[in-house]
């Protein structure tokens, strides 16, 4: 027998190398085969409910890292709730209607307008479902636990029916109306857009300063006076029907030197405008308040059939332009709102494809709207005073990445103004993480206009509206309920397969259709109405879920998206929010803080990460970042996270190895019988349990990450485990000293494995497979630990905190001795502590082997007054380091005066000799194979 065989060197097959890319799919297959999601739900039956509602990602393409951040975050929350006494099902969903799918088919050469609509819609449906399958596999590869066999998809007939019921309820309350207000119009999509479908980019535009000649000055302005206006959208001059001034603003009539014309501009902008127009000097003829100019009539710059009225508007400012805004009610929200007050014509001169219409005039007809600036300049002639290129923020279609325009076309709207205050009241009842989300959503709802819900596309849920012969829109409860039932049985495809009369209730009549003829709406609903109805189609429809949901968790862009649309529909129908709490997260940027894009080549694919590092590394990254703000990720950052993971894994591997001979049923030592330092570690660990428990409840994953990393690296690796080896390796296998430490090891190992399961499920499942005495087959079926508190806990923590300060001081003294070549390793040291009475009292109170804790072979405690001049001194304490006396024990590696060669061929100290002689009699009898001496 070899001497080292008398040591209790921890043994385990648990590998240091994780090999996550290969092992994770094996664990996922095992979970699926064991039906773990179902079993966890069964375990939680009857417990308090926690229901997170999954905001549906769009079913198109593989997932990106933003999806991963979102789904992993949700999984962490649901897993932690499931293991903490809550019935917490997780039903994933997908958004499956909308333009992107039509665009994919168009790129494949499929022409919607040249084929049967029902056939086209079925192609859209099949493509969407194929993308659901693709993304489902991607999410499962991340280890997300969910009801994958029963997700919700917005194209499902049941969901479509419930969506129609939401629409019908809003219509019944009078919240649905038709209007011709200007809406965001995407010529590239040939459809109206909602605010949530808009993104802004900085672009360069040609702005024009031009003048309208006064036709009827109402006794205030002469007819040789010109009112100067400014536009950044020259094409809209074709539809200009008014000039808006600020009622309380001051306007001057000026006559430039050498000109026979006089011009009206805002007083506050005159100096800057004079420079732009080349007016070296001018004469001020008069001053007027904007309100004085109301109802003055001007000529259109070139259209002799059009007069433009001077009107008043509060939206006019002195920030730019001339203080006078040309007003085209068909091309702007402010223009429309102020124009309708004065009954201005709502002229629209651009068609759905962005081409100028016939009513724009023969010079413009058929031209693309963004290319007509030279024609406008030519038509203005000498009325043009200046032109310049400006850089400004402009709205774009978020899908096609093309600029959009405001365009007044007949659309269906959901009123928000009718119940806006009710929505705002509900926001104030909602909990927000982070708290600033409340103000953000509140302001968005407060300031938003009514919601345009119609779209001029094909792939979506039809607006269930019929028209009588006299044009009356029909959307009564009887009709919408009937359509909902048809959709539930057949899907919304039936809308396109049947005539209007076959979609109406049998025997339906209407006074507006004396001949019994009806037509149906051909527009579809905004896809935000789809997902915005999910509270009804999912949470209110499934028996194992509840409405309102406990939590909605999405990116911060959803304040204007899903959070917004869901809130509007829910309050409209039921008077309350669809959620009790909202958690929003920032965007995922690359390592430099830049937006990810294919063109930059900086996209991080979750699938690539899973192949290179493993999903648990991506999950640990999610826990490591502050998602209240934008977060960064790169392969380098993930490499750093992987290194942290390695430290955690190897620390837990040490605990596994050194509890391999520990049976918790027979070997556990009661807390009261633990050593002082073991009690301290038990208290510290339970504080960690409390911290993690609280952080899970607050959805603060980063706090968990920081606490775990600190505990593993500082409390365990750098302290407890550093000296624990000298006990668990060296003391007799069944000794009290060793079993005490193993008790703490095992307690930490089991509980931290449970605590980390929501974040690192693959790794903790692998650890759990080595814990043979734990009854649950999978750690996911276990319950979270509950933090304990102990007698005199605060006093114990205070004493050990003081010791940690002493330990740091001692390490500095040892380091100086090492640098002075007095010692090599700290075990070569004889450390003398010159202590004040206060420090002596502390060391006595610790009731511990201080030499063991400081990892020195010999320790002496002396009076502070006896400290030599060359001692390493601190307040109330000093240290002297000398080389320890004696020989190195071959077994304990400590220097001990009692170390000598024994009769059984072992060069060991008395303490090791006693352990050998009591526990290895055969080796003593036969002698050890070899000795270094």
From Swiss-Prot:
One of its GO terms (cellular component) is cytosol. It catalyses: tRNA(Ile) + L-isoleucine + ATP = L-isoleucyl-tRNA(Ile) + AMP + diphosphate. The keyword Membrane does not apply. It is found in: Cytoplasm. GO terms for molecular function: aminoacyl-tRNA deacylase activity; ATP binding; isoleucine-tRNA ligase activity; tRNA binding. It holds the Pfam family Anticodon_1. The keyword Aminoacyl-tRNA synthetase applies. CDD domains: Anticodon_Ia_Ile_BEm (cd07960), IleRS_core (cd00818). One of its GO terms (biological process) is isoleucyl-tRNA aminoacylation. Keywords: Aminoacyl-tRNA synthetase, ATP-binding, Cytoplasm, Ligase, Nucleotide-binding, Protein biosynthesis. Its EC number is 6.1.1.5. A motif ('HIGH' region) lies at residues 57-67. ATP binds at residue 598. PROSITE patterns: AA_TRNA_LIGASE_I. IleRS has two distinct active sites: one for aminoacylation and one for editing. The misactivated valine is translocated from the active site to the editing site, which sterically excludes the correctly activated isoleucine. The single editing site contains two valyl binding pockets, one specific for each substrate (Val-AMP or Val-tRNA(Ile)). Catalyzes the attachment of isoleucine to tRNA(Ile). As IleRS can inadvertently accommodate and process structurally similar amino acids such as valine, to avoid such errors it has two additional distinct tRNA(Ile)-dependent editing activities. One activity is designated as 'pretransfer' editing and involves the hydrolysis of activated Val-AMP. The other activity is designated 'posttransfer' editing and involves deacylation of mischarged Val-tRNA(Ile). This is Isoleucine--tRNA ligase. It comes from Streptococcus pyogenes serotype M18 (strain MGAS8232). The gene is ileS.
């Amino acid at each position: 027998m070899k001497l080292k065989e008398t040591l209790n060197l921890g043994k385990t097959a648990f590998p240091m190398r994780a090999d996550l890319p290969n092992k994770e799919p094996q664990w996922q297959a095992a979970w699926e085969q064991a039906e773990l999601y179902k079993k966890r739900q069964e375990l939680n039956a009857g417990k308090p409910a926690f229901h997170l509602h999954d905001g549906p990602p769009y079913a198109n393409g593989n997932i990106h890292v933003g999806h991963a951040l979102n789904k992993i975050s949700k999984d962490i929350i649901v897993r932690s709730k499931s293991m903490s006494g809550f019935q917490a099902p997780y039903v994933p969903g997908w958004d499956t209607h909308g333009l992107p799918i039509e665009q994919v088919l168009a790129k494949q050469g499929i022409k919607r307008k040249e084929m049967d609509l029902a056939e086209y819609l079925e192609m859209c449906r099949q493509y969407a479902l194929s993308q659901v399958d693709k993304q489902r596999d991607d999410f499962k590869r991340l280890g997300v636990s969910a009801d994958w066999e029963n997700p919700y998809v917005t194209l499902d007939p049941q969901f479509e029916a419930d969506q129609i019921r939401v629409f019908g309820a809003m219509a019944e309350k009078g919240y649905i109306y038709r209007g011709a207000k200007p809406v965001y119009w995407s010529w590239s999509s040939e459809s109206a857009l909602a605010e949530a479908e808009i993104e802004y980019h900085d672009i360069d535009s040609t702005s024009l300063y031009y003048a309208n000649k006064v036709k009827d000055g109402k006794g205030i302005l002469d007819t040789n006076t010109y009112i100067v206006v400014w536009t950044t959208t020259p094409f809209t001059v074709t539809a200009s029907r008014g000039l808006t001034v600020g009622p309380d603003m001051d306007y001057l009539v000026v006559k430039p030197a050498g000109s026979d014309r006089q011009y009206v501009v805002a007083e506050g902008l005159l100096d800057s405008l004079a420079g732009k127009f080349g007016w070296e000097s001018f004469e001020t003829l008069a001053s007027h308040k904007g309100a004085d100019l109301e109802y003055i009539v001007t000529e259109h710059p070139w259209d002799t059939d059009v007069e433009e009225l001077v009107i008043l508007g509060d939206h006019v400012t002195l920030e730019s332009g001339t203080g006078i805004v040309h007003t085209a009610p068909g091309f702007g929200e402010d223009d429309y709102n102020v124009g309708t007050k004065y009954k201005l014509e709502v002229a629209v001169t651009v068609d759905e494809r962005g081409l100028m219409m016939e009513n724009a005039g023969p010079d413009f007809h058929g031209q693309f709207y963004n290319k007509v600036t030279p024609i406008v300049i030519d038509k203005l002639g000498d009325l043009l005073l200046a032109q310049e290129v400006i850089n400004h923020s402009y709205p774009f279609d978020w899908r096609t990445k093309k600029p959009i325009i405001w365009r007044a076309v007949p659309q269906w709207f959901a009123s928000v103004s009718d119940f806006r205050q009710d929505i705002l009241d509900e926001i104030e009842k909602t909990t927000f993480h982070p708290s600033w989300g409340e103000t953000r959503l509140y302001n968005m709802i407060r300031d938003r206009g009514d919601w345009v819900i119609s779209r001029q596309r094909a792939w979506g849920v039809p607006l269930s509206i019929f028209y009588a012969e006299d044009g009356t829109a029909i959307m009564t409860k009887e009709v919408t309920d009937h359509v909902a039932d048809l959709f539930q049985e057949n899907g919304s495809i039936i809308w396109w397969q049947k005539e209007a009369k076959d979609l109406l209730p049998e025997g339906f009549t209407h006074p507006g259709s004396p001949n019994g003829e009806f037509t149906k709406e051909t527009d579809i609903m905004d896809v935000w109405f789809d997902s915005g109805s999910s509270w009804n189609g999912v949470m209110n429809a499934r028996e194992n879920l509840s409405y309102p949901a406990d939590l909605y968790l999405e990116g911060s862009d959803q304040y204007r998206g899903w959070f917004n649309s869901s809130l509007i529909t829910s309050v409209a129908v039921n008077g309350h929010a669809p959620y009790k709490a909202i958690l929003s997260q920032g965007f995922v940027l690359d390592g430099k803080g830049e937006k990810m894009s294919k063109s930059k080549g900086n996209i991080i694919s979750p699938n690539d990460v899973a192949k290179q590092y493993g999903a648990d590394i991506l999950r640990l990254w999610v826990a490591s970042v502050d998602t209240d703000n934008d977060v960064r990720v790169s392969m380098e950052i993930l490499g750093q996270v992987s290194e942290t993971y390695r430290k955690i894994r190897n620390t837990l591997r040490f605990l596994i190895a050194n509890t391999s001979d520990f049976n918790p049923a027979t070997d556990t030592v009661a807390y009261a019988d633990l050593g002082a330092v073991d009690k301290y570690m038990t208290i510290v660990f339970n504080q960690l349990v409390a911290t993690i428990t609280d952080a899970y409840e607050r959805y603060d994953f980063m706090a968990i990450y920081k606490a775990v990393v600190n505990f593993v690296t500082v409390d365990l690796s750098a302290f407890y485990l550093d000296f624990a080896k000298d006990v668990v390796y060296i003391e007799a296998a069944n000794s009290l000293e060793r079993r005490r430490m193993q008790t703490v090891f095992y307690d930490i190992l089991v509980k931290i494995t449970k605590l980390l399961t929501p974040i690192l499920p693959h790794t903790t499942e692998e650890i759990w497979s080595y814990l043979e005495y734990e009854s649950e087959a999978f750690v996911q079926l276990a319950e979270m630990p509950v933090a304990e508190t102990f007698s005199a806990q605060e006093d114990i923590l205070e004493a050990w905190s003081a010791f940690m300060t002493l330990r740091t001081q001692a390490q500095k003294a040892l380091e100086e001795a090492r640098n002075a070549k007095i010692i090599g390793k700290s075990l070569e040291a004889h450390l003398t502590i010159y202590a004040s009475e206060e420090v002596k009292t502390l060391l006595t109170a610790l009731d511990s082997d201080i030499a063991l804790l400081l990892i020195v072979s010999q320790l002496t405690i002396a009076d502070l007054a006896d400290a030599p001049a060359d001692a390493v001194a601190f307040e109330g304490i000093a240290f002297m380091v000398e080389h320890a006396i004696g020989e190195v024990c071959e077994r304990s590696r400590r220097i001990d005066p009692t170390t000598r060669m024994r009769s059984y061929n072992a060069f060991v100290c008395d303490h090791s000799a006693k352990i050998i002689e009591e526990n290895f009699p055969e080796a003593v009898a036969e002698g050890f194979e070899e000795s270094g001496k």
